[in-house]
Structure formats: C-alpha cells, structure tokens
C-alpha cells in the first residue's frame, strides 16, 4: 500500500491525493500552516488521515515554539465537519499538558490508526459473505487513513480471508474520490472492482447486483452520520431494496455530545462543480451549491463497524 503520509527529519510528507491516480507525489510540510493548507486543499483527506495530519501539524508548531492553543484553533478551522480533526488536536493538547512531546503523540496516533483500522476490518469481515458484491461511496480506504482503511479496510480484510468479493465504486462527484482513489486502491490489491456514476447506484441495487453497502464517516452521532455528499441517496436506495447499509468508522469519529443535524456542513468552491480538468462544463457565472457532506439518519443504518465491534445505531 502507498503511504498516505510519513514523518521524517522533523518534516511531514503528505501524499498529494489531488494528483492520483496518475501521479504519485509527496508534499513536504515544514510548518503547521503547510499542514493546514494540505488539509484545506484536500491533498490529504479522509477523517482519520486528517486527524493524524493535524497531530503532526501540532508537532511542527511545537518544534517552532508556537503557542499550542492558538495553532490548535487554527488547525481545527481547516475543515469543520471531520470530528477526528478536533479530537486529534484536543488529544495532543491534553497529552502535551501532561509532559509528552507533540511529536511522540503524533507518531503514536499514526501507529494506533493503522491498528484500529485492522481491527475494524476484522469485525467487518464477519458480515461479508463469499461471493458478495459490495457498493461503496467516496474513499474510506488506506488513503483516507494512516493506512489500511475503514470501509475499504473491511473489503481488504475479506479479500485477505480469501473470500470471493466484487466491489462497486461510485465515482463520487465532484472531486471523484471513488473514481480516482477507491478504484485505484482496489486495483492495487487486485480486488475485482467496477466504477459507476453516482446516479447508477440505485439502478444497480434495483437490478439485484448489490449485496451490501459499506461507507465511511466523517462524524458519527447518536442520530446518524455525516459522510461525503451522495451518501444519503445511496442509503435511501439501500433501504428501498432491503440491502444492508453499514458504516465503518473508528471511535474517534464519534461525537457523543451533539446531534448529527448540528454538524456544520462544509461548503466548497463552485469551481469543483463547474470545472473538470480545469475546463468549465457550465457557464462561469452559474449559481452553484457544493456541500461536501450530507446526513444519513440512524434508521437507514444497519450497523456501525468500529474497533470495538459492530454497534447498532441508536
């Protein structure tokens, strides 16, 4: 598996995911503001990967002698929906106040993330049957984490258990994480995969070509989850055709204090929708709504696969 990020000589290197799958290139982060830029521009994306990157951003700030509380607030503002970002910054601040170095905390967090994801894969494998076709939306794989992945980690674990599985990836407009990243990961692992446009998900379910749906999450609350835009549409189709709909996410993605509809839904630039490969597909002055996430309510969710086991939504 290609590394999403790595720490070397007191520098953080982020795989530039905006250039995948055609170019593998790492961006060097020398300052915490470099990390913020990497998060905002989606060079690094996926809730767990954002959290680990944020921890390393805090480490760079500490090495530079910055005020940790101030830079913590700056890093938290990079992307408001992913709860792991807030969790990681708060964890670093807490452990630094107890005498640990931010670098050590970040390194430990990176290692823990991979171990947690493998545990999620282990539990998730128990719900995968031989010859299953699994539909997934966006990218909740190794590229969205420090390694292995959550939703794709479950698929990876089933493949490692020699189960015969087929994967369907939604393209995931407008940034195409499914087409560019999830398909790329499956091809790297030689896991059979088909790419479909987002609007075809319901059609595939209606035809009986989907056995299970597994997605990741950027925030899990007691009454639902926030995930990449289009997840709700997939969940509604799965409910209509009685297809199990699972969410795979670490406990660090859980928000126990707020309702899911209190989530701040990030609005991204119109150009993501208006342009493909730098070319406008609609007039530049077209009004655009570009929410990055939507809400899947708990009654649409069969189970939430975590490192602690498979939890029933409340």
UniProtKB/Swiss-Prot annotation:
Catalytic activity: 5-(methylsulfanyl)-alpha-D-ribose 1-phosphate = 5-(methylsulfanyl)-D-ribulose 1-phosphate
Key word Amino-acid biosynthesis present: yes
Single GO biological process annotation from the record: L-methionine salvage from methylthioadenosine
SUPFAM superfamilies: NagB/RpiA/CoA transferase-like (SSF100950)
Keywords: Amino-acid biosynthesis, Isomerase, Methionine biosynthesis
Signal peptide: none
Active site: 218 (proton donor)
GO molecular function: S-methyl-5-thioribose-1-phosphate isomerase activity
Annotated binding of substrate, by residue: 45-47, 79, 177, 227-228
Domain of life: Archaea
EC number, UniProt record: 5.3.1.23
InterPro entries: IF-2B-related, IF-M1Pi, IF_2B-like_C, Initiation_fac_2B_a/b/d, M1Pi_N, NagB/RpiA_transferase-like
UniProt similarity note: Belongs to the eIF-2B alpha/beta/delta subunits family. MtnA subfamily.
PANTHER family listed in its UniProt record: METHYLTHIORIBOSE-1-PHOSPHATE ISOMERASE (PTHR43475:SF1)
Function: Catalyzes the interconversion of methylthioribose-1-phosphate (MTR-1-P) into methylthioribulose-1-phosphate (MTRu-1-P).
Protein name: Putative methylthioribose-1-phosphate isomerase
Annotated organism of origin: Methanosphaera stadtmanae (strain ATCC 43021 / DSM 3091 / JCM 11832 / MCB-3)
């Amino acid at each position: 598996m290609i590394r999403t990020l790595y720490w070397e000589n007191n520098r953080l290197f982020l795989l530039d995911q905006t250039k995948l799958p055609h170019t593998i290139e790492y961006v060097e982060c020398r300052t915490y503001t470099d990390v913020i830029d990497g998060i905002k521009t989606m060079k690094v994306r996926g809730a767990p990967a954002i959290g680990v990157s944020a921890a390393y951003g805090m480490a760079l700030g500490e090495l530079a002698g910055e005020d940790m509380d101030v830079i913590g607030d700056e890093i938290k503002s990079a992307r408001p929906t992913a709860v792991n970002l807030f969790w990681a910054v708060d964890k670093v601040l807490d452990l630094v106040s107890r005498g640990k170095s931010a670098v050590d905390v970040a390194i430990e967090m990176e290692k823990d993330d991979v171990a947690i994801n493998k545990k999620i894969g282990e539990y998730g494998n128990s719900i995968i049957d031989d010859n299953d076709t699994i539909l997934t939306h966006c990218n909740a794989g190794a590229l969205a984490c420090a390694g292995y992945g959550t939703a794709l980690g479950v698929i990876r674990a089933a493949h490692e258990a020699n189960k015969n599985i087929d994967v369907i990836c939604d393209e995931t407009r407008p940034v195409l994480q499914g087409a560019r990243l999830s398909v790329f990961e499956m091809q790297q692992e030689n896991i059979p995969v088909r790419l479909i446009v987002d609007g075809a998900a319901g059609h595939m379910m209606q035809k009986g070509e989907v056995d299970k749906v597994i997605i990741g999450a950027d925030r899990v609350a007691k009454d639902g989850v926030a995930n990449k835009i289009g997840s709700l549409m997939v969940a509604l189709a799965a409910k209509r055709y009685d297809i199990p709909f699972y969410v795979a996410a670490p406990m660090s993605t859980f928000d126990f204090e707020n309702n899911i509809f209190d989530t701040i839904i990030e609005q991204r630039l119109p150009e993501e929708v208006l342009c493909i490969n730098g070319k406008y597909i609609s007039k530049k002055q077209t009004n655009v709504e570009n929410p990055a996430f939507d809400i899947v309510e708990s009654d649409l969710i069969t189970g939430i696969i975590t490192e602690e086991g498979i939890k029933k939504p409340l």
